[in-house]
Amino acid sequence: MITVSAETPMEEVIKLCQAQRITRVPVWRLQTGQRRVIGVVTLKTSLYEPDFDPAKQAGDYLQPPLYLPEDLHLESALKRMQRSGQWLAIVTRQDRREVGIVALQDILRVLFGEVGR
């Protein structure tokens, strides 16, 4: 999974997204010596901001992250993601430590199999 620091200029985020053919990137910041995901940058939302500036940092264009516990059933995870409108979620342990990231596409693939484009 590709992530960027909150201090990464949006110009770099855009280039990274183009190179990797992605539209959403989790953003992290060091907190007490550990990387913590603090949000998600979505290109579509960022680029349509009236005051968008590619020199600004990724942290200036964050959407709040959705956290899902690692033991949550997939059907419940799907419902939470649908309600929140998020396409990415941060998976956490009971102690709130981050253990991974799941995309809506991953959940749909597991529940329904591959869907043609």
Indicate residue ranges for each PLM-predicted region.
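Soluble cytosolic regulatory domains appended to membrane proteins
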Residues: 1-117
